[in-house]
């Protein structure tokens, strides 16, 4: 169930679903699994807000366990394509593809709530049953290219070397807000609407 907000206007009452009301304040909620439908919705909202006024920031609240690499990279590419700065605020968690998205916010405007978590790891893939050996080799090569692409983005976003990111992402690596700040993925920890 999506909550409805009722506003008083000069013409009377107007009701919005909560996400439409937040969008009026340039707030986008990226929550749940990153997949094509969700990515299309996020991209459409980014493009709409940028077309509306590209001099104002967009606020992207992130709480995701990750998901599809291609869907996530489409969001990141759009964030980089538009003129508006995209502030990212991690609440709950940014894991896997979520770290790529959250760390791709405008430099100096990447935030995290104090009890949120970050997790980086290498990308996962599979070929399914009954796959030919040559197809498995192609899939393995593609997975290695994808891993390099993601590690380069994380290195660029954090200021760490690709080698360090590669080593740290070998297995699931969970980080607290302070550890995420120290690593360079965020610029500040937000507490009570104040920055630390």
Curated annotation (Swiss-Prot):
Q: Tell where it localizes.
A: Cytoplasm
Taxonomy, superkingdom: Bacteria
GO molecular function terms listed in the Swiss-Prot or TrEMBL record: ATP-dependent peptidase activity; ATPase binding; serine-type endopeptidase activity
Reaction(s) this enzyme catalyzes, per UniProt: Hydrolysis of proteins to small peptides in the presence of ATP and magnesium. alpha-casein is the usual test substrate. In the absence of ATP, only oligopeptides shorter than five residues are hydrolyzed (such as succinyl-Leu-Tyr-|-NHMec, and Leu-Tyr-Leu-|-Tyr-Trp, in which cleavage of the -Tyr-|-Leu- and -Tyr-|-Trp bonds also occurs)
Keywords, comma-separated and alphabetical: Cytoplasm, Hydrolase, Protease, Serine protease
- Per the similarity annotation, which family is this? Belongs to the peptidase S14 family.
Against PANTHER family, the record matches this protein to: ATP-DEPENDENT CLP PROTEASE PROTEOLYTIC SUBUNIT (PTHR10381:SF70)
Name-wise, this protein is ATP-dependent Clp protease proteolytic subunit
Q: Which organism is it from?
A: Streptococcus agalactiae serotype V (strain ATCC BAA-611 / 2603 V/R)
